[in-house]
Design a protein with these regions (language model features):
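Extracellular glycan-modifying ectodomains
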Residues: 2-474
Length: 474
């Protein structure tokens, strides 16, 4: 064999070996792969089953490809390299859930409609949410409990100059615009964080995280407690220390597993409270504290924006209970003896308030009904379930029946006497298995014994000055 041919064959063999090794590298590194589902805010593909429901899984290889793509060794580094190239070379976001803004800012894509003033709530949805919050407030007031509602503004609501130019704002009203007006109309005690933050020349949200800083959380805390009837500590002399060690959520969505290097402002506070029971993280569904320096007992319904504020509240109250679960369990007031309730929700999730009613005993109402139209043949939905100590009856009323200010009552009849319970005007989208939120719903939590002992139940709707009735069989 000529020498030149031999050298060529050797090079060819070396090339083949290198190629095979490169192909096998991701497979060999599988044991080193890690779960990045939390950082990417999605569930990674599971390893497929060969059989499903006793039959051969014909999608096995497609599902295996998805699993391997999500779990191959070194995937996070390849994703990071691709993301960096897209962001810094092409000026594009590699993650459809993240908006690449100006000046290195990142925004959550789910806030785009709010930014553009494209409301996901109808006007009646907004009114229904405000009525629900007013009913929650009345429930608290009747028990001598203070109530405050607040909304954590989206980052691009406060700092629009850092949004990309191709995101255009319309002249319409956002969910928050509509709801703020309805809260005022129905007299709901509202801590307006949007107005407070807009007054500040300093940015209190992190450029590459969707939340406010601890310093921004302090501003929110002060705004909220200033709406309460009793005075609480404002931590007026607190100082903040800057450290570049924060685990920014939007960065993790772009760069899963990236080091924690974003700037955070940490408060210099010595806390006296202690956490009851086990504590895992700020995202625990329930955090209970005792021994705070202040007075009173707090029940706070919160989301991830509460991660940087709950310690302030825990210190300001002797006892506190922070809950992330929905529906909001307002009956917890009696269990813990709370004298204050705060409900905080981020702007982008306001639509959720129209889709799930709080869990509390429905208020009794005095009504005189002489006659009502039977609408049981209309396009209504009525369903029920047992929910803890409650009998939960919910559904929807035929849309053509309803005006913008409808009310729904559950009638419990026993021994010829009728008791009226007002339902929340909430459409239980998840329970009704609807793909979208509607604005013609009702949801009512009755004490279980009321439903059990009643001779009959019915649904009474008041709309356009008329009464409409739907009999219900338990």
């Amino acid at each position: 064999m000529p020498a030149g041919v031999g050298d060529f064959m050797k090079k060819k063999v070396v090339f083949i070996i290198i190629y095979v090794l490169l192909c096998l590298t991701p497979l060999a590194m599988l044991p080193l792969s890690k779960d990045t589902s939390a950082e990417e805010k999605r569930d990674l593909s599971a390893f497929p089953e060969v059989k499903k429901e006793g039959k051969l899984n014909l999608s096995f290889f497609t599902e295996f490809d998805a699993w391997f793509t999500d779990h191959m060794g070194g995937r996070s580094y390849l994703v990071e390299a691709q993301t960096m190239m897209k962001e810094y070379v092409f000026g594009e976001s590699a993650n459809s859930s993240v908006i690449l803004g100006k000046n290195g800012w990142l925004f959550y894509e789910e806030t785009a409609d709010d930014y553009a003033n494209v409301a996901s709530l109808t006007e009646r949805n907004s009114r229904n949410v405000a009525v629900t919050l007013r009913m929650m407030q009345d429930y608290c007031t009747e028990r001598g409990v203070d109530f405050v509602f607040t909304v954590a503004p989206n980052k691009n609501t406060l700092y629009p100059d850092n949004m990309p130019a191709w995101y255009v704002r319309t002249s319409g009203k956002s969910n928050l615009d509509m709801l703020a007006a309805d809260l005022d109309r129905f007299g709901v005690k509202y801590a307006d964080l949007k107005s407070m933050f807009l007054k500040e020349p300093k940015a209190y949200y992190q450029p590459r995280d969707s939340h406010w800083t601890y310093e921004g959380g302090m501003l929110a805390y002060r705004t909220i407690v200033n709406k309460l009837s009793k005075e609480h500590s404002l931590f007026e002399d607190v100082k903040f220390t800057e450290r570049a060690d924060w685990d920014a959520d939007l960065v993790n969505m772009m760069y899963p597993g990236a080091p924690d290097t974003d700037v955070q402002m940490y408060p210099e506070i010595t806390y006296s409270f202690t956490v009851k029971g086990a504590f895992v993280s700020d995202m625990d569904m329930v955090i209970e504290t005792t021994g705070g320096a202040g007075e009173g007992s707090l029940l706070m319904f919160r989301d991830s924006f509460g991660n940087t504020t709950w310690r302030y509240f825990a210190e300001a109250f002797a006892e506190a209970d922070f809950e992330r679960a929905v529906p909001y369990r307002l009956n917890t007031i009696d269990r813990i003896g709370a004298d204050t309730v705060v409900l905080e929700i981020v702007e982008r999730n306001l639509k959720n308030l129209a889709e799930k009613a709080p869990m509390m005993e429905a208020p009794k109402r005095n009504l005189e009904v002489l006659d009502a139209y039977d609408i049981s043949d209309r396009d209504n939905q009525v369903a029920s379930r047992t929910a803890g100590v409650f009998f939960h009856i919910y559904g929807s009323i035929a849309p053509e029946i309803l005006d913008e200010d409808y009310h729904v009552y559950i009638i419990a009849k026993k021994s010829g006497n009728a008791v009226f319970y007002e339902a929340f005007p909430i459409y239980e989208r998840e329970l009704l298995t609807s793909e979208r939120c509607c604005d013609n719903g009702f949801s009512c939590y009755l004490p279980e014994e009321v439903a059990t002992e009643a001779d009959s139940l019915g649904i009474l709707t008041v709309s356009n000055g008329k009464y409409y009735y739907i009999p219900y069989t338990k």
